[in-house]
């Protein structure tokens, strides 16, 4: 039971010993999610493109995935893709499916940018993001769950229960 800033834990009596209670300091709350707002630019055939407000979300409970939420119009649109895909796309073209990421060398402002290509049955979109925003997001996500340690954050019992239910 949490009491103040410590846990009180009742211990069962062991033969020859009395019932005791032990105070254990409460662990500080550990952040398990990363959210970063990013300004994207939707590429168009003419002009500088259209601004698209978005956010990137990463959670330790889904350690392989990034959730990109694009805000605009009447509803938000969410795409989920691999964190490794975003990381690999910073230095070379990555992805062969609905989401592709690559460095952007033809940005009108000349700043390092990342191109995100999204394809669905409803249409395609090319979005540019500042490389610095993407790197900042990945640094924070990697600090939360270092690359290669994702399996330590998976609840396999819960996953199996969802698969069989």
UniProtKB/Swiss-Prot annotation:
Region Disordered, annotated ranges: 1-21
GO biological process, any: division septum assembly
Classification via Pfam families: SsgA
Compartment annotation: Cell septum
Matches recorded under InterPro entries: SsgB, SsgB_sf
Sorted UniProt keywords: Cell cycle, Cell division, Septation, Sporulation
GO cellular component terms given for this protein: cell septum
Location, primary (coarse class): other
Top-level taxonomic group: Bacteria
Subunit structure: Interacts with SsgA. Interacts with FtsZ (via N-terminus).
Task of the protein: Involved in sporulation-specific cell division. Required for early stages of sporulation. Important in the process of growth cessation prior to sporulation-specific cell division. Recruits cell division protein FtsZ to the future septum sites and tethers the contractile ring structure (Z ring) to the cytoplasmic membrane during sporulation. Stimulates polymerization and filament length of FtsZ in vitro.
Family per similarity comment: Belongs to the SsgA family.
The protein's name: Sporulation-specific cell division protein SsgB
Native source organism of the sequence: Kineococcus radiotolerans (strain ATCC BAA-149 / DSM 14245 / SRS30216)
Gene: ssgB
